[in-house]
């Protein structure tokens, strides 16, 4: 949102970790890979968007686990990678070194491949352009970032 102070469009992405299971995958290969964008407007409040590419943000999942909330359908995958579409249980699939979160959409039929594709794209932008070399070389604790700001009047 710092770009808004200068009447600029700001974008930020983060990649890394291994919490997201690819569509039809059996192992977590990507992080939640969130994106944030802020766009100034002339007379109205700015457009600000921030979202993970998984069905639920990692920090929100941790918070809900601490307060004893139940899993919702489509948040996580079973150990074999199949989406858990029943929900209602504890966070058993979300614990341990591999959280097995699903891409937004949960299943191929509901469009999970689209958010998985976005997550890979964000990983490329973050990892490759920052010399982080992408998810193949980042261990679970490392992150790579992409940050940009565009002058709106530069496109007029």
Q: Which ranges hold each PLM region?
A:
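Secondary-shell segments that build the walls of catalytic and ion/ligand-binding clefts
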Residues: 69-134
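Phosphate/diphosphate-binding glycine-rich loops and adjacent basic-rich segments that engage nucleotide
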Residues: 20-94
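Catalytic-core signal marking the mid-to-C-terminal active-site face
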Residues: 124, 135-156
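Structural beta-strand/beta-sheet cores of well-ordered domains, especially the beta-sheet scaffolds
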Residues: 8, 33-35, 45-47, 72-73, ...
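Generic structural signal for well-ordered, non-membrane alpha-helical segments
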Residues: 30, 114-118, 156
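A glycine- and small-aliphatic-rich helix-loop capping segment at beta-alpha/alpha-beta transitions
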Residues: 1-10, 26-33
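Glycine-rich phosphate/pyrophosphate-binding loops
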Residues: 7-19, 122-140
């Amino acid at each position: 949102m710092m770009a808004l102070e200068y009447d600029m469009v700001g974008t930020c992405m983060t990649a890394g970790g291994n919490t997201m299971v690819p569509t039809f995958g059996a192992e977590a290969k990507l992080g939640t890979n969130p994106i944030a964008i802020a766009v100034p407007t002339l007379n109205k409040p700015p457009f600000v968007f921030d979202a993970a590419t998984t069905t639920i943000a990692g920090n929100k999942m941790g918070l809900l686990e601490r307060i004893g909330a139940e899993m919702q359908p489509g948040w996580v995958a079973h150990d074999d990678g199949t989406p858990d579409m029943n929900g209602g249980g504890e966070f058993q699939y979300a614990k341990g070194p591999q959280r097995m979160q699903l891409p937004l959409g949960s299943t191929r039929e509901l469009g999970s491949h689209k958010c998985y594709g976005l997550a890979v794209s964000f990983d490329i932008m973050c990892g490759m352009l920052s010399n982080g070399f992408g998810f193949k070389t980042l261990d679970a604790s490392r992150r790579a970032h992409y940050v940009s700001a565009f002058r709106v009047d530069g496109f007029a």
